Amino acid sequence: MTGPVSAQAGLDGDLKPTLSLYLAVGLQAGAVIALQLAIMRIFAVGSWAHFGSLVVSLAMLGFGLTSAIMCIGKRWFERRWRGIAGAALISFGPLTVGSNLLAQQVPFNAIFIVSDPMQKWRLAANFMLYMLPFLAGAFYLGIVFLKAGRIFNRVYFADLTGAGLCGLAFLLAMYFLAPEDLILAPLLLWLAGGVLWFAAFASRAGLAGLSAAAFVSIAGHLALPPLLDAPKLAVSDFKGVSYARKFPDSERIYERASPFGYIEVYASSYLHFAPGLSDNAAFTLPQMPANAYLGMYIDGEGPSGIIRDLPPEQTAYYRFLPMFYPYLIKAAPDTFVVQFGGGISTSVALRNSRTVTVAEGNPAVRDALRTDKELREFTGDVLNNPKVRVIDYDGRLFLARTSQRYDVIDLSLADSAGLSSPGGFAVIEKFSYSREAMASYMRALKDGGVLSVTLWNKEEPPKSVLKLYATMVAAARELEEGDIANRFFVAASYLSTATVLYKRGGFLPDEIRKLAAHTRAMSFDAVYYPGLEYDESQTAKVLDDYRKQIFSNAGLDPESAPVAIPAAGSESAAPETTDHPLPATLMGQLAWHRLILGGWEDVAQRYVFDTRPLTNTRPYFAGFVKTRDLPRVVDRLDLLQDEWGYLLLWATLAVACLASLPLILIPLIFGWRTIFRRNPGKLRVIIYFACLGAGYIMVEVGLISDFMLALSNATVSASVLITGMLVFSGLGAFYSERYLDRARRVMPKVFIGIGCMLIAYGLFLDRVLDLIGTLAYPLRLISCFALIFPPAFLMGFPMPVAMTSLARLGKDHMFLWAWGINGCFSVIGAALVPIVATSFGLGAVLVIAGGAYLLAIVGFFAVLLPLPGGLAPAHMAAVPA
């Protein structure tokens, strides 16, 4: 390690490059990103993940606020830079612990965010509290960037590389720290970085202050909550696990924390979990199985029912579950279960199949069922059953690559419990339900094989099930030309589940009769089968009633007048029936009628929600509210609780835009005469750094979602992207130094290279990732890193080249302002990604990001404009050529 910085730089001098400086910056940048991840995990376990994303996104505006303050008071900060940097660094730890502890004492309830104004203030309090440590981190990094302006590319390399590697370290820490203690991870990184910083300056006072702050922070986190009887992590009363904890005889029999989720399993006689179970089971079976389920909760969400190994005399119970449908017409089949979950589909399959292959991509779930003695005894050691073959990755990926064929393929309630969560759900990729995945399942069937897909059907008006219906029909049409009317059988239970059966080659008349008879015997609703009549005269009323249900106020919905929609596939309406199905059932029947016979596009346009099929580029059971209808629903959010995750993205985008505008303009307004009037090309500088901020974060966030297509696990995808993007960009930042003197000639080529690569990725990446997903997992990881490297490396050039150029030109105020612009538009870009993805697809995110980098060329040359007179201050290097 090199000698102390104090020996090389005076109080008012620039920082000199030392190993201590780079390590301190890297660790502190890592502490900031670890804090972001910790807060999001805290919200994921305590309330709902999208609220954590909202709070972190807005708290990161603290970087823009820091930039504005430092820009106005630059001289004051320069004179006191060492003291301010030290104070900001020391305060990061206590502020992290204090803000988190206080935030847990003012939890907000998503359920009442519309009806109770106090909930909005509680959400605002969380935002303000969590902003405090980010402000401290931003002041420290801002001071370092300002004083190290001439070597910005190297400091930026340390910042990005440190953040990437520390982000990976945080993911590893999730194996050892419970969610309520994850805040310790950023604290340890902060402490290590602080020691290096103060040791480099040989500052005993700084080390003493840091030691005291670290002791207070860590002791405060560990000791204060039990002393004050205050929770470290407050779990919402409306989370699934909260109900389980309150049962009188509740017992937690399993607990494990890992990057793949915080898993808890509870036992209770009050726990009843039977998805889609027919009501007829209670009075048909001689005896209902007692204590048949354990409740498995991942990050507090659930339960996923872990079913007991039933004795032979009780297995008639399986017949009343929707997963039983395919076994009515397939005897002793070879069965594939796409996702194990809690094992219900696997148990049904074991009772009725010759062989069973089951996939489970979450290693934490597999380990729990394979290694815990109590769970193994309860389930009959199902995953170690010699009749069961276990695939230890996503079933979707296995079926896409295998040459094996199956009689029955079952996809039941995979990752879909959150579709009716009272907190809404975030915009989460559901690749298992995409059109491409469904086509893979259908191809993996033997001739006459049956695909059975069961989804939660708890929404009124129906939303998710209509997307599922459209997706499965689109997949079937992709596989075979001509009439597909006899390929499907669909049944549903109101506000419970819906099951779609697809048979390769089509259902025989006897099979249709058998399935229909079972549907009646279970008191399920028949939604579609060949020959089921649908009364077309009801179409206009069904659509009109649903629009009125959402847009009930006069004048809100100009389209609400009844409209006659011509019958599809017939000249006249079907005869009147005496049955009066529920509106949701009618809507399902209408959907299938038009999907099979034609005219669905017209109905989908009229329907109140977006029902487009899921695809690999748009794999979302979210974003149901059509963009044009957003202004109409802001005063009736209580009707759209399951869309709050999506609607909050719009709120985040709006708040970020409104907050960013003054943060960008404040330095301009207060410093116009003394600071900015002499700086040429201000508008183009805004464009440049806005494009970099939005473009980079859109690529990073967008690729995390994209890579789940090949890696199948959100945690692995995030770790690969965070590490790969930041480390490779850091290498690019370091390498860019050799091109500073040729920036005017080289950088346009860099921007064109980035733009073309990102646009190409946007157009073709999903197909490449589909192929990568069929490789062995180590090869998948290597391939993903290889895909990240080219754009990420080049994306490391623009920021340090521009910032170093500003510093060398003596445009220090512009330097600080540009950093703030970049930070503000990073927040805006992050909020924009899921909105663009749900509306236009993940590919569009990368195309827009590529366009942003191409647009940045316009602003780059403004960055290189010298101050009037053409001379930089004497201590600065020459202007890049």
Language model: regions and residue ranges:
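Alpha-helical transmembrane segments of multi-pass membrane proteins
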Residues: 2-881
